[in-house]
Curated annotation (Swiss-Prot):
It comes from Ailanthus altissima. GO terms for biological process: photorespiration; reductive pentose-phosphate cycle. InterPro entries: RuBisCO (IPR033966), RuBisCo_large_chain_AS (IPR020878), RuBisCO_lsu_C (IPR000685), RuBisCO_lsu_C_sf (IPR036376), RuBisCO_lsu_fd_N (IPR017443), RuBisCO_lsu_N_sf (IPR036422), RuBisCO_lsuI (IPR020888). This is Ribulose bisphosphate carboxylase large chain. RuBisCO catalyzes two reactions: the carboxylation of D-ribulose 1,5-bisphosphate, the primary event in carbon dioxide fixation, as well as the oxidative fragmentation of the pentose substrate in the photorespiration process. Both reactions occur simultaneously and in competition at the same active site. Substrate binds at N113, T163, K167, R285, H317, S369. Its main location: plastid. GO terms for molecular function: magnesium ion binding; monooxygenase activity; ribulose-bisphosphate carboxylase activity. GO terms for cellular component: chloroplast. The record marks K324 as: Transition state stabilizer. PANTHER family: RIBULOSE BISPHOSPHATE CARBOXYLASE, RIBULOSE BISPHOSPHATE CARBOXYLASE LARGE CHAIN. Its cofactor is Mg(2+). Pfam families: RuBisCO_large, RuBisCO_large_N. Binds 1 Mg(2+) ion per subunit.
């Protein structure tokens, strides 16, 4: 057969509705908005082609390989209900297209070039199915939820954290002082803000030293294990590892990384270092909204969350749900399950397009953070359950009497909610009552309740997705 030059429709090669997916395929669900006049089959096939073996014209070297073995295939297309000219296109990629143990390569292939494609008006990656054959090539989360609880000796309740504010401008000594006050009051963790790296007003080494001092003092005082997420994110991988090494030398339990701005290559390196040296790793998702905010273009956060579980991290920020709509609650809980559980069934009502089997890759603790305070505690306890970290920045430091009383208020509220739940009370319905009862015994909690007046907890049933 002679080589036939020229441009031919993608759908002739890459749209294969009869294809039966293999267990080893990486499956992707894209939300495709084609340009006017482009049929959905052609758009879906174009996505499959450009993110695998295809290019815009037939090339002579196609004859030197087996396209059937290596091409991505668009095997199903369904219109999105309620949206005109939007389709979910399912694409199957053969496993051989990806380098083992590299999230970087996986994303370069699947979302690398194709998002700037002219035939598409918009494109969003909604979900990925990672086959066990691929996930087994990753180290994954460094320790997992059970190991973390054993390291910290904390069981049967969510963990409490607090981001130190003002995020920029404090000197190292004052920063350490704020950390000490929070930990002494009853928090498990305090946190560097994601943009605290090593700035002129507070260099990283000074901060690490003063925070370590705060950790050891508060541990001695309370008899509990304490931690501070020391942000090791830096301008180069070498500098990042240097900071992690220093944290290990100080004997602290946990460091932190901004995994999207730092990049997956750096994150995976840090995760490997931290597992080898017994450090927990807290992951912040700064920049995620640049990628996942738009409904019709970009990448859904559940994909970024799965990628993090492959790359490695022990905690990751996952939104709060509270005060938002029911639909968001279901979707958030969908990717929280993808982070924590071993086996997650396909469930379109929660935005889960594929059944995901993690084959005993350790889980990641979801972190609820952002605009939450003591009145939210019952809802947070009910929604996230024990395996989570609840982080109150302003909700601790904004307490009228200071940081330590703010920490006390949060800890008392949490313990009250956990106890009430264990006694069989309904936190969603009786939440305010539980907090009010607890505040009778805790002046710190009473003061916090007064500052952030009641928030209602009715969850109206909203339409999902």
């Amino acid at each position: 057969v002679g080589f036939k030059a020229g441009v031919k429709d993608y759908k002739l090669t890459y749209y294969t509705p009869e294809y039966v997916t293999k267990d080893t395929d990486i499956l992707a669900a894209f939300r495709v908005t084609p340009q006017p006049g482009v049929p959905p089959e052609e758009a879906g096939a174009a996505v499959a082609a450009e993110s695998s073996t295809g290019t815009w014209t037939t090339v002579w070297t196609d004859g030197l390989t087996s396209l059937d073995r290596y091409k991505g295939r668009c095997y199903n297309i369904e219109p999105v209900a309620g949206e005109e000219n939007q389709y979910i296109c399912y694409v199957a990629y053969p496993l051989d297209l990806f380098e083992e143990g590299s999230v970087t390569n996986m994303f370069t292939s699947i979302v690398g070039n194709v998002f700037g494609f002219k035939a598409l008006r918009a494109l969003r990656l909604e979900d990925l199915r990672i086959p066990p054959e691929y996930s087994k090539t990753f180290q994954g989360p460094l320790h997992g939820i059970q190991v973390e609880r054993d390291k910290l000796n904390k069981y049967g309740r969510p963990l409490l954290g607090c981001t130190i504010k003002p995020k920029l401008g404090l000197s190292a000594k004052n920063y350490g002082r704020a950390v000490y006050e929070c930990l002494r009051g009853g928090l498990d963790f305090t946190k560097d803000d994601e943009n605290v790296n090593s700035q002129p007003f507070m260099r990283w080494r000074d901060r690490f030293l003063f925070c370590a001092e705060a950790i050891y003092k508060s541990q001695a005082e309370t008899g509990e294990i304490k931690g501070h997420y020391l942000n090791a994110t830096a301008g180069t991988c070498e500098e990042m590892i240097k900071r992690a090494v220093f944290a290990r030398e100080l004997g602290v339990p946990i460091v932190m990384h901004d995994y999207l701005t730092g990049g997956f290559t750096a994150n995976t390196s840090l995760a490997h270092y931290c597992r080898d040296n017994g450090l927990l790793l807290h992951i912040h998702r700064a920049m995620h909204a640049v990628i996942d905010r738009q409904k019709n273009h970009g990448m859904h956060f559940r994909v970024l969350a799965k990628a993090l579980r492959l790359s490695g991290g022990d905690h990751i920020h996952a939104g709060t749900v509270v005060g938002k709509l029911e639909g968001e609650r279901d979707i958030t809980l969908g990717f929280v399950d993808l982070l924590r559980d071993d086996f997650i069934e396909k469930d379109r009502s929660r935005g889960i397009y594929f059944t995901q089997d993690w084959v005993s890759l350790p889980g990641v603790l979801p972190v609820a953070s952002g605009g939450i305070h003591v009145w939210h505690m019952p809802a947070l306890t009910e929604i996230f359950g024990d395996d989570s970290v609840l982080q109150f920045g302003g909700g601790t430091l904004g307490h009228p009497w200071g940081n330590a009383p703010g920490a006390v208020a949060n800890r008392v509220a949490l313990e009250a909610c956990v106890q009430a739940r264990n006694e069989g009370r309904d936190l969603a319905r009786e939440g305010n009552e539980i907090i009010r009862e607890a505040s009778k015994w805790s002046p710190e909690l009473a003061a916090a309740c007064e500052v952030w007046k009641e928030i209602k907890f009715e969850f109206p049933a909203m339409d999902t997705l």
